[in-house]
Amino acid sequence: LILYALIFVLAFCSIVYELLLGQTLSAFFGNTVLRYSVTIGLYMASMGLGALYLQWRRARSSVLRLQVVEILLTVCGGGSVVGIFLLDGAGLPTLPLSIWAHFLIIVIGVLTGMEIPLLIEIRNRDRRSSETSVLGVDYIGAFAGTLVFAFYFYPTFGLVPSAFLVSLLNAVVGMLLLTQRGKLGSGERGRFHTLLAGQALLLAVLALLLWRADAISEMCLSLYLGSS
C-alpha cells in the first residue's frame, strides 16, 4: 500500500512539473495551445526515452537508482520556473531561453520514464505480474495532478510557490523510499543513506524556499516586467 501511495504521488508531481513549464512558456512566449501541445508531446516522448535508457543500463539496485532519480527530479522540478525567470531577467535571448525550457521538459520526462520501470521492478519483488496495477495507479496520479494544478495550485498559489510545493512533496516521497531499504543489498546501504541525507538537505532547502515563496514570486514578477 505504501508503494502504491508513492507511485501515485510521483506521477502527480511529474505531470505538475510539466504543466508548470507549459504555463511558464505560455507567459513568456504566448500561444498557449502550442506551448502546452509541445510540452506534453515532448514529455511523452522523453518518458519513452527514459524507459529505453533504463533497459539498456540496468542498475544493481532499483531502489538506489530510484533515489537518484527522485533527487534529480526534485532539483529540476523545484528550480525550473525560478530558473527561467532568472535567466530571462539576466538578459538571455529568447531562443536560448526557449531551448533551456524545452531541455528541462525533456530531462523531467526522461527521469519520469525511468521511474515507472523501476517502480514495477520494486513491486515485482513482492508480487509477480503487477505491472498493470503500477501503471494504473501511475495514470490516476497523473490525472489527479492535472486537476489539482488547474483548479487549485495555479489559481491559489501561482507558478513559483506551486513549483516549490510540488518539489517539496517529491522530496518527501524520496525520503519515504526508506521504507524500501529492505530490498537493498548489504553493500548498497551506505550509498543509499548518503543519498537519503542529500534528499533530507533538499527537503530543508525547499521548506525554506516555500516559506519565502511570496517574496521570490514578487522578485520573479519584477524581473519579468523589467524585461518586457
Where does each model-flagged region fall?
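Alpha-helical transmembrane segments of multi-pass membrane proteins
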Residues: 1-228
